[in-house]
C-alpha cells in the first residue's frame, strides 16, 4: 500500500474551527465525488449527499442541530459548507453505507487541505417537522 495513502489516514483529524471563506467549487466537487464513489451494500448507492453552501440554509440546519443537541452554539463550528449524508433507513446496510460515504469524503477533503468534523444528529433533525419541511424545500 502506498505510504501517502496510509499517511493520509493517519494524519486526518477532526477540525473544530474554520475560516469563513468559501470552499473552492472544484475542491467541493471532488469531495462530493469521493462520497458518491463510496462502497455501499449491494452496490445500491442509496445514500443522498446534500452540500449546504447557502448561508440561509446553513444557519437553519445549524439551528435545528443545536436544538437537538440542547445548545445555542453552532454545532458545525463555523464551517462554510455543511455536507449531510442521508441514508435510506430501509436498506439493511444504511449505517455502514452512510459511514463509508462520510469517510471517503473526509479523506478526500484532508487530501485537498480541507478540514472536516463528523457531526451527528441528522436523523433527529429530519424526523422533526421542521427538518421534514426543510427537505421539501430542497
What feature does the model see in each segment?
Residues 1-138:
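Acidic, surface-exposed loops and disordered segments
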